[in-house]
C-alpha cells in the first residue's frame, strides 16, 4: 500500500511539473505574440500620417482599424504630403499579410512613394517607379495602392491605382460615382508595369474618398455591395466634415463578416477649380 501511495505521489508530482512547464510555454508564447503586436502597432503608427496636409479649400481626414479587434496589425495605411511643385499627394494602400513583416514593408512602400514623388509628381510615374523599386527589393509581398495628386492652383485631381479598390467621388450638385478607370497590377510583382492615370477638374464642392478592401469586401459581403453602400453614404454626406465622413465610411467594414484591417482617406474640397478659373480671392 505504501509503495502504491509513493508511486501515486510521484505521478502527481510529474503531472504538476508537466503542467507547470506547459503553462510556462503558453505564457512565453503569449508574451511573444504581445511583443509582436506591439512592434507591429509601433510600425503602423510611424507609417500612418499623424497630420494630413490642408490647403485653402481642401481638408483631409483618415481612419484606420486593425484586424481581429487589434490583435492583428495589418498592412493598410494612408498618407498625405506636399510635393515640390506645390501640389499635394495622397496615397492609400494595402500590403499583403497581417504581421510585423507586413507592417515593416508598409513603411518601405510609403518611403518609396515619398522619395519618388520628389522627382515626379505624376501619379502614373510615381506608381511605376515605386513598383520597379519594390521589384528590385525582391520582397515576397505585394501591395495594392492608389496615389493621387491635387493641384490647388488649377483644381485638377489626377489619380492612378495599382490593383486597388476604386475611389468614390461625390459632389454637392448631386453627382456621385465609383471611379472605375483602368488600373495596373499590384506593386512589387512585375517590373515595367504601366499605371494609367485619370484626371478631373474639381469645379464644385464635394468629396473624394479612398479606401481599402477591408471596408467593402468580406465572406458575407460582395465588394459590389460594399462599394454601393459607400457610394450611397458619400453621396448623401459629401458636405459633412471630412473627419466625420471618414468615421462613417469605416463603419461599413462592420458589414463585411470578417476581421480584416481597414483604412479610409477622405478629401473634402470647396470647388477650387471654379475659384482658379474666375480668379477669385
Residue spans of the language-model regions?
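Short amphipathic alpha-helical signal-transduction/dimerization elements
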Residues: 20, 110-118, 216, 231-238
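C-terminal catalytic subdomain
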Residues: 15, 203-204, 210, 215-281
Amino acid at each position: 500500500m505504501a509503495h502504491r501511495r509513493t508511486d501515486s505521489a510521484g505521478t502527481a508530482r510529474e503531472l504538476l511539473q508537466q503542467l507547470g512547464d506547459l503553462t510556462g510555454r503558453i505564457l512565453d508564447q503569449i508574451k511573444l505574440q504581445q511583443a509582436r503586436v506591439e512592434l507591429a502597432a509601433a510600425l503602423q503608427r510611424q507609417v500612418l500620417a499623424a497630420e494630413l496636409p490642408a490647403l485653402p479649400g481642401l481638408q483631409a481626414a483618415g481612419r484606420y482599424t486593425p484586424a481581429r479587434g487589434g490583435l492583428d496589425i495589418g498592412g493598410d495605411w494612408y498618407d498625405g504630403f506636399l510635393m515640390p511643385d506645390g501640389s499635394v499627394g495622397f496615397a492609400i494602400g494595402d500590403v499583403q499579410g497581417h504581421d510585423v513583416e507586413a507592417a515593416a514593408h508598409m513603411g518601405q512602400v510609403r518611403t518609396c512613394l515619398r522619395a519618388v514623388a520628389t522627382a515626379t509628381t505624376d501619379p502614373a510615374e510615381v506608381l511605376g517607379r515605386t513598383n520597379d523599386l519594390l521589384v528590385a527589393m525582391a520582397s515576397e509581398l505585394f501591395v495594392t495602392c492608389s496615389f493621387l495628386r491635387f493641384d490647388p492652383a488649377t483644381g485638377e485631381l489626377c489619380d492612378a491605382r495599382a490593383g486597388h479598390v476604386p475611389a468614390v467621388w461625390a459632389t454637392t450638385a448631386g453627382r456621385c460615382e465609383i471611379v472605375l478607370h483602368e488600373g495596373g497590377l499590384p506593386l512589387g510583382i512585375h517590373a515595367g508595369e504601366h499605371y494609367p492615370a485619370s484626371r478631373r477638374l474639381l469645379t464644385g464642392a464635394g468629396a473624394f474618398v479612398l479606401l481599402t478592401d477591408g471596408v467593402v469586401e468580406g465572406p458575407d459581403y460582395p465588394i459590389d455591395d460594399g462599394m454601393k453602400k459607400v457610394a450611397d453614404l458619400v453621396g448623401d454626406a459629401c458636405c459633412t466634415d471630412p473627419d466625420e465622413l471618414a468615421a462613417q465610411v469605416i463603419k461599413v467594414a462592420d458589414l463585411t463578416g470578417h476581421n480584416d484591417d481597414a483604412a479610409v482617406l477622405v478629401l473634402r474640397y470647396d470647388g477650387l477649380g471654379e475659384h482658379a478659373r474666375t480668379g477669385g480671392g
